[in-house]
Amino acid sequence: ELAHDTATLLEAHRLGIMDAVALKLSKFGGLSATRRARDLCLNLGAKMCVECTWGSDIVMSAALHLAAATDPARVLNVCDLSGYVTPRLAPDAPTREAGRIAPPTGPGLGITVDVDRLGPPDMILE
């Protein structure tokens, strides 16, 4: 639960206290950084939970794809909390059925985001 970057992963491994780790996209700073953390955990022999901290449909789709691209023997679980977040941002987002969930199969993250639900941007960089 306390891991949030490469340094914390390496320190936990050095101390011998990292049998498993929660990789949260929001804590690591997005999908690319979490993928690098996942790769490090694979190299260090740790098992993983792949998730986000109360993420939306968008972030949950990313987490599902990351988990699906990881050796199943190393994934303990994927915690889906997106169903509790409102409003839902993608009508075709994956949902749990009988305790299971799978990544969407469309292009990109596999979902169609309802951009009207996002609201105006806080910042535009040009």
Show the residue positions of the predicted features.
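Shared catalytic-loop signature of beta/alpha-barrel
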Residues: 3-100, 104
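C-terminal extensions of enzymes
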Residues: 88-126
